[in-house]
Amino acid sequence: MESYAVSRRTLLQWIGKTAGAAAMYQAMTSLGFAAETRHDEQFALSGAPKGASVLVLGAGLAGMTAAYELRRAGYKVKVLEYNAKAGGRCWSLRGGDRYTELGGATQECRFDEGNYLNPGPWRIPYHHHAVLAYCKRFGVKLEPFIQVNYNALVHSTEAFGGKPKRHREVQADFQGHVAELLGKAVNQGALDQSLTVEDREKLFESLRAWGALDHDGNYQKNMESSLRRGFAVDAGGGLMPLAEPSEPIDRHALLDSGLWKKLIDGQEYEYQSSIFQPVGGMDMIAKAFERETGEMIRYGSKVTRIDQNEQGVTVTYKNSDGSGEAMQDKADWCVCTLPLSILSQIPVNVSQSMQDAIRAVPYDSSVKIGLQFKRRFWEEDEHIYGGISYTNTPIEKISYPSTDYGKPGKAVLLGAYVWGPNAYEFTAMSPEQRVKKAVEYGALLHEQYPEEFDNGIAVGWHRVPWAQGCYGMWSEGSSEKHYRNLCQIDGRIVLAGEHASYIPAWMEGAIQSSLDAIKRLHTHAVATQRAA
């Protein structure tokens, strides 16, 4: 048999790619190797030039952050916002809300009181320090968001007759089978030239612990594996039956199914516990910012042109409903937080390099569908409390509510979170068709769907009038060429938003981008005044 040297680093990288971060960390710990966004909670600008004014375009989180901090510094601030309320993509839909998308389709949300859908952001990772800091400052109550639920489902129409498996079964069996194979490689001496005897023993023990292997290094039906994957019969009390171990999924069938690909989601940095959500809906954050900045905001204002010269900035706008004449506001400086998908359609007097950057970033497509059911059958029938189920069908995910467990009556779950080509296909449908498809696909995981379904609402982000896309989707090439040009101050204008951050699509990116932009703009404004 051919032998070859494998370094510790290569071995760990291979384990990580094959078995995931948890396995790699377990191995790193055994071999003695294993031993985040920045935000200044004391951030404050001061000493604004006397009488200096700033126009902020857009009252999403980036815009309201800029308005809040600039006013604290002493600037005169006015915000122009397209919608009748603030928040932008930080948005929740509740019963009674009406929403009209591009193309004219209007939906009225018919959810019961207390139920809601977050069409945009829905999670706050523990390391998104800026978002959490403003939540604390403004008194936004938070609660846990359940990302990983080991009793949730993993499903493929091409595996196991289309029947879903439990997350815990797939994870336990995948870890067990991989650990068994790696353990055999260790014991057969394949790594002897690269690992000491002590390393080999420690690595084998770590694989036994990680994969729930028996003393001989095998993964099989027994009490140890069932403590990971669940029992065929759970333990009881008194004269009830003893616990019975369950049968692991066949290794070849599991590998062929591809279900293991979904295990990585909860291990990615952005989705690791703890994760939070505002009590009552994500727009509680927007409403908190709005309480601090609302008097500066002119609602229902559609920006149509942005001009600048050496003296200041002039923004032309009209009422969003089309009524009235065009209006203009002037200021010394401008912080523009409009999505690039919108800004690229507006005449803007900036350098060619910034214009090129504005037009270089396409916006990803996404669709979210909220479904209200007559009862919480996922809890009552299947004991799924929060978390996410995954499927290879176009709906991709079903996310169960992380709050009000056991509450009687109707409840809403996220019935689809669609990306890529499927999102374009769903966006082309009518809202009613999107909801119908979500119910059809969801029924492949939960047979209760058709009988328990009550009503739904669907948001396709490329049809959202004020965004026309989900988020700025930088490529490596476009980022290298255009990112710095997009973020630099251009005369008297600076851009901010998730698209001007290294954390696109996240609220944290929007806020961090805004703080960086206004800090630089303030420094520039002060220097300009001194030089005058």
Describe each region flagged by the PLM.
Residues W14-I15, G20-A23, L31, A35-E41, ...:
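Conserved flavin/dinucleotide-binding core of flavoenzymes
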Residues N149, L153-E201, Q372-Y385, G406-P450:
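Mid-to-C-terminal "cap/lid" subdomains and adjacent gly/pro-rich loops that border
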Residues D40-G183:
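N-terminal glycine-rich phosphate/pyrophosphate-binding loop and immediately adjacent elements
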Residues L45-A48, E108-Y116, W260-S274, R291, ...:
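Short glycine/proline-rich turn/loop motifs
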Residues N151, E158-A159, L182-K302, E310-G312, ...:
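Active-site/ligand-binding neighborhood in enzyme catalytic cores
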Residues G114-P125, Y271-V279, M354-P362, P421-E432, ...:
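Active-site rim elements
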Residues M1-S7, F33:
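N-terminal secretory signal peptides
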Residues Y299-L414, L445:
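Mid-domain catalytic core of redox enzymes
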